Amino acid sequence: GGSFQEGNHGAGTGCTVGKIRGPQFAMKGGIGACAYRQGDLMVGAIVACNAMGDVLEKGRIIAGSRNDEDTGFADSEEWLIANGRRQKDIFSGKFVGENTVIGCVITNAALNKAQANKLAAVAQNGIARAVRPANATFDGDAVFAMCRGTVPADPDAVGSMAARAVEEAIVRSVK
C-alpha cells in the first residue's frame, strides 16, 4: 500500500477555500483525515474541503478568503451577513456547483441502518464547527457513514467522536 497525503493531494487536488468574495481571494483547500479510538471502538473521517467559507481551528480562521490588502482574512461569515445579495451575484455564473465539503465517517461500531443515517447527520456537525459559513445555498456539504458493525457502542458517543473527527480532518486538510 501507499501512504496517505493530506492537503492538496489526491481528491484534495484543486480544492480551494474562502471563495465567497470571489476566486481571486481564495486559498488552497485539500483532503484531511482523522481517527479516534475509545477502547475497542474506532471512528475515523476523511474529508475533502472545497469550501465556499473559511476554515477555523479553535474559533480562529486558519484558511479562507483573504482580505483586500492580502494581510489576513476577510471573515467570510461576516462578509456574507453584510453582503448577502452580492454573494449571490458572484455565484450566479460559472462558480455554481464548485463548493463542497464532502466526507465519509468510518467506524467499527455496531449500528443499524437508522443509527448509521443519524451518525452521518451528527457527523455533519464537524463541518459546522470547522467551516463558516457552512451548509449554504451554494455548498454541497455532505457526510456519509459506513459501519463495520463489530463493536457494541452508544450511538451518541459514536456521533460525538465522528463530529470531532470530521472537524479535525477539515483542519488538517488545509494545513
Could you say what each language-model-derived stretch is?
Residues 1-175:
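A structural signal for small-residue-enriched, beta-sheet-centric alpha/beta enzyme cores
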